[in-house]
UniProtKB/Swiss-Prot annotation:
GO biological process terms held by the UniProt record: translation
Keywords of the record: Ribonucleoprotein, Ribosomal protein, RNA-binding, rRNA-binding
Keyword rRNA-binding: yes
HAMAP family: Ribosomal_uL23_B (MF_01369_B)
Protein name, UniProt field: Large ribosomal subunit protein uL23
Name of the encoding gene: rplW
SUPFAM superfamilies: Ribosomal proteins S24e, L23 and L15e
Biological role stated in the UniProt entry: One of the early assembly proteins it binds 23S rRNA. One of the proteins that surrounds the polypeptide exit tunnel on the outside of the ribosome. Forms the main docking site for trigger factor binding to the ribosome.
GO molecular function, one term: rRNA binding
Length: 91
């Protein structure tokens, strides 16, 4: 899997913005990507050193629209911790 295929988008929320002060950055990643692939992708794309990767899986939620029901997409979120002395990604 290519590095650009692993990372989908950065997650910008109040909680993730506060974590950026501690060099922790949050990304939506491909559901098939593992921690090693996420680490390699972040290091390759942003030219930084990664210390740790934590991954959270979100199950699809039930949704209804009138009489039709379905599910939202499942997603996978990665929290990437950078090593000391790395450059800020979004600042």
């Amino acid at each position: 899997m290519e590095a650009r295929d692993v990372l989908k988008r950065p997650v910008i929320t109040e909680k993730s913005s506060e974590a950026m002060a501690e060099d922790k950055y949050t990304f939506d990643v491909d559901t098939r990507a593992n921690k090693t692939q996420v680490k390699i992708a972040v290091e390759e794309i942003f030219d930084v050193k990664v210390a740790n990767v934590n991954i959270i899986n979100y199950k699809p939620k039930k949704k209804r629209m009138g009489r039709y029901q379905g599910y939202t997409n499942k997603r996978r979120k990665a929290i990437v911790t950078l090593k000391e002395g790395s450059i800020d990604l979004f600042n």
